[in-house]
Amino acid sequence: MTLDLSKPATAGYLSGFANEFATEALPGALPHGRNSPQRAPYGLYAEQLSGTAFTAPRGHNRRSWLYRIRPAAVHRPFEPYAGAQRLVSEFGDSADVPPTPPNQLRWDPLPMPVEPTDFVDGLVTMAGNGSAAAMNGCAIHLYAANRSMQDRFFYSADGELLIVPQQGRLFIATEFGRLDVEPFEIAVIPRGVRFAVALPDGNARGYICENFGALLRLPDLGPIGSNGLANPRDFLTPQAAYEDREGAFELIAKLNGRLWRADIGHSPLDVVAWHGNYAPYKYDLRLFNTIGSISFDHPDPSIFLVLQAQSDTPGVDTIDFVIFPPRWLAAEDTFRPPWFHRNVASEFMGLVHGAYDAKAEGFVPGGASLHNCMSGHGPDADTFEKASASDTTKPHKVDATMAFMFETRTLIRPTRYALDTAQLQADYFECWQGIKKHFNPEQR
């Protein structure tokens, strides 16, 4: 099976989360009984791609063996890349990262580019924390593009890329095979995996959380039991597919927040077979099994957790990826929207589709908001008044929505670009100014 991004994929996927997969595009391309034979089938080269330390515990160890036409080392030397100058990977004080205000922040969608712009050149860093060099924290990027990647390929050595499309499908050709991803789905490209992105719908826009630290995993379910939230079988990994092309190609690498380019005389998407548990995957957010209260109160948003990156502190994650999908609300005598909140964690939100049930207006698909550590937030004035007077004896369906959140244990620091851009809503704070005083000490 070969790669062709000019049309939708016809191959199926491999089902499961972090399984030990084995797949080949040519019969017998996978060596039998060993990883690195003296001579691999079809004249291929054996190459291991390690996503964790060799000595990581078996349950956390991630690696794959790739059988490819040429090793990944075959390319010309890298040199600085002149494009995509709005990326940041170090989130200490700098010209790119000014002092972080405690204000609630919200942005309109990133505009579509006027000039031809592909996925790589359409990247801009909005915020983040930690350090790519120290392999902790994350960077939160937006992308807006209107052209497919042409004879160029990209990888990030800084972290795994959690991609959340908001507008336009992405046909992603990777070393492991192909992922077709549309809005309402997510894709995760592991650190180091080379890929190219085609835009079948012309324009594309979305969000990326680049995870510098421990790999994303499914959360433990605790009292929920053995099923629920994001079920492992619904995660899809590509089957092996390759292209054997020679020509003048460009390989772009992201290392320590900077982009580098190298000439390469062949397509690096030349893996004919592979096996292992370190591979790209996608997931349809519409398959999320939402948990909620059927008595009273609005549970904590941790019930909406899709993926987590764990820290060295039990119960505290470096990154939580949370969604707010369509769902039924049935709690009686309860304020049903998300409540007013101050959080030790920091919250970057985006909206894929529809409206968010805590904001009547201003938060639109493609937009974003940031509520940092201990910054008060919650429903706007209109939402509060309506929800306080609604009939809670009847269930209500929150429909036509798909919001999400990147939540982190440490401060999410907006970049200079994010604080200076015209998309920043200077009047965001006004949505709470109309909240009325109802207190009356004479009337309970």
Curated annotation (Swiss-Prot):
Molecular function as annotated in GO: homogentisate 1,2-dioxygenase activity; iron ion binding
GO cellular component: cytoplasm
Cofactor(s) listed in the protein's UniProt record: Fe cation
Record's catalysed reaction(s): homogentisate + O2 = 4-maleylacetoacetate + H(+)
EC category name: oxidoreductase
Keyword Metal-binding (UniProt): yes
A single GO BP: tyrosine catabolic process
UniProtKB keywords: Dioxygenase, Iron, Metal-binding, Oxidoreductase, Phenylalanine catabolism, Tyrosine catabolism
Pathway: Amino-acid degradation; L-phenylalanine degradation; acetoacetate and fumarate from L-phenylalanine: step 4/6
List of catalytic residues: 298
InterPro entries cross-referenced by the UniProt entry: HgmA_C, HgmA_N, Homogentis_dOase, Homogentis_dOase_bac, RmlC-like_jellyroll, RmlC_Cupin_sf
Positions contributing to homogentisate binding: 356, 377
EC number: 1.13.11.5
Chain sites annotated for binding Fe cation: 341, 347, 377
Family designation: Belongs to the homogentisate dioxygenase family.
Assembly information from the UniProt record: Hexamer; dimer of trimers.
Alphabetized PANTHER family for the sequence: HOMOGENTISATE 1,2-DIOXYGENASE
Function field: Involved in the catabolism of homogentisate (2,5-dihydroxyphenylacetate or 2,5-OH-PhAc), a central intermediate in the degradation of phenylalanine and tyrosine. Catalyzes the oxidative ring cleavage of the aromatic ring of homogentisate to yield maleylacetoacetate.
Name listed for the protein in its UniProt record: Homogentisate 1,2-dioxygenase
Organism: Burkholderia cenocepacia (strain HI2424)
Record lineage: Bacteria, Pseudomonadati, Pseudomonadota, Betaproteobacteria, Burkholderiales
Gene name, Swiss-Prot/TrEMBL: hmgA
